[in-house]
Amino acid sequence: MSMSDPIADMLTRIRNAQMVEKVSVAMPSSKVKVAIAQVLKDEGYIDDFAVKTEGAKAELNIALKYYAGRPVIERLERVSKPGLRVYRGRNEIPQVMNGLGVAIVSTPKGVMTDRKARATGVGGEVICYVA
């Protein structure tokens, strides 16, 4: 059976792994998932990630991050879904928790944070909120 929303699956795997305090989580890899993982790493929400390729299948391993025994990611919420895509122009990109969190946006210039998209002057599809 094919998966209807692989990005939502990725976010759910991260959320579930952090609830049971796993050190890392593995999932099927794709270019968009790797780009999202890179943004999460750059913003300090995860420790590291690696893509392991075996034959035709690639697996994305994400090392989760904790602070004082609690997960660094408190909120991980999918915004744009396959049934209802959410696009925002460069002046309409939302702030998460008044700038304390991050909105991950897929733009023509790649996947980036809301702050970088505003600074670059591009809009795009709001993938998720992270706080």
UniProtKB/Swiss-Prot annotation:
UniProt KW Transmembrane keyword: no
Gene Ontology CC, one term: ribosome
Keywords (A to Z) from UniProt: Ribonucleoprotein, Ribosomal protein, RNA-binding, rRNA-binding
The keyword RNA-binding appears for this protein: yes
InterPro entries: Ribosomal_uS8 (IPR000630), Ribosomal_uS8_CS (IPR047863), Ribosomal_uS8_sf (IPR035987)
GO BP annotation list: translation
GO function terms (MF aspect): rRNA binding; structural constituent of ribosome
Functional summary from the UniProt entry: One of the primary rRNA binding proteins, it binds directly to 16S rRNA central domain where it helps coordinate assembly of the platform of the 30S subunit.
Protein family according to the UniProt entry: Belongs to the universal ribosomal protein uS8 family.
Subunit annotation: Part of the 30S ribosomal subunit. Contacts proteins S5 and S12.
NCBIfam families for this protein: PRK00136.1 (NF001109)
Designated name of the protein: Small ribosomal subunit protein uS8
Gene for this chain: rpsH
